[in-house]
Amino acid sequence: MQHLDEIIANATAEIEQAGSLVALDEVRVQYLGKKGHLTLQLQGLGKLDPSERREAGQLINKGKQAVQAMLTERKDALQTAELEAKLAAETIDVSLPGRRIENGGLHPVTRTVERIEQFFGELGFSTESGPEIEDAFHNFDALNIAEDHPARTDHDTFFFNPDLMLRTHTSGVQIRTMENGKPPFRFIAPGRVYRNDYDQTHTPMFHQVEGMLVDENVNFAQLKGILHDFLCNFFEEEVEVRFRPSFFPFTEPSAEVDVKRKDGKWLEVLGCGMVHPNVLRSVGIDPEKYSGFAFGMGVERLTMLRYGVNDLRAFFENDLRFLKQFK
């Protein structure tokens, strides 16, 4: 039987030399495992004289406890060193400049829609919405648009079938709102609309805001006053406005609204008019009792004028160099 003091001395040296938890566990197995040196010492007690067996057993157990205590102490030291090394590697140098956080910004078209909603909201107009896939009644028939009107052809409209299409304007929202309520009405309807056109000033999808007011004794002078105030508010300056006679199937009389630019030229910004009696009749409103006005504007066109953008398509190209200018 190997001398116990020698075994303890060797175990002590190997425990102190263990540089990792893995190496330390190997030492534990070597001395305390099923076939470890101290385990074999205990198994060899049966070969001793009974008079020596008790004392030898006590010495071996005492040595075993000493080795176990050294293993535990060394394990704690290695774990502490490992944690300190990990923390040191993850230390943040607070003197280094931080990562720059990019601030986002609203899209210019969104800014314009919100500006329009805010102005008309202060005048008591609610904001309504409706489906972008519309049927012929709400997109054409109820708006007094004749069967042979060019807008009903696939040159101008994206049809799914003869009765379903991508809406060409948000006027359908006006019809649905009036169908589901009773006058008086005062609301705007912003949203995406679709037309089969694509060039520098047109895209197949664009945004529109239409508005409507229906009540007793509504007149064109009220419409002119509201739109003049809106345009001055939108461009944040007093602008010269003119109303030109025009034709829209859903309004009578109808007008196009121009603003005078700084270079003296007139530029069309929206269309408007008094709601046609046939439109009121289509939703069960008596045109002898009620009258109303309606207006519609292209959001991208107003945005182009406000920010001096020349190509409408730039709003939809997702070029950050362009969009960052509007933060």
UniProtKB/Swiss-Prot annotation:
GO cellular component labels: cytoplasm
Keywords recorded for this protein, A-Z: Aminoacyl-tRNA synthetase, ATP-binding, Cytoplasm, Ligase, Magnesium, Metal-binding, Nucleotide-binding, Protein biosynthesis
UniProt cofactor note: Binds 2 magnesium ions per tetramer.
Broadest EC class assigned to this enzyme: ligase
Localization of this protein: Cytoplasm
EC number: 6.1.1.20
Catalysed reaction, written as an equation: tRNA(Phe) + L-phenylalanine + ATP = L-phenylalanyl-tRNA(Phe) + AMP + diphosphate + H(+)
A GO BP annotation: phenylalanyl-tRNA aminoacylation
Pfam families according to UniProt: Phe_tRNA-synt_N, tRNA-synt_2d
Cofactor(s) recorded in Swiss-Prot or TrEMBL: Mg(2+)
A GO MF label: tRNA binding
InterPro entries registered for this protein in UniProt: aa-tRNA-synth_II, aa-tRNA-synth_II/BPL/LPL, Phe-tRNA-synth_IIc_asu, Phe-tRNA_ligase_II_N, Phe_tRNA_ligase_alpha1_bac, Phenylalanyl-tRNA_Synthase, tRNA-bd_arm
Family the UniProt entry places it in: Belongs to the class-II aminoacyl-tRNA synthetase family. Phe-tRNA synthetase alpha subunit type 1 subfamily.
Quaternary data: Tetramer of two alpha and two beta subunits.
Descriptive protein name: Phenylalanine--tRNA ligase alpha subunit
Source organism phylogeny: Bacteria, Pseudomonadati, Pseudomonadota, Gammaproteobacteria, Vibrionales
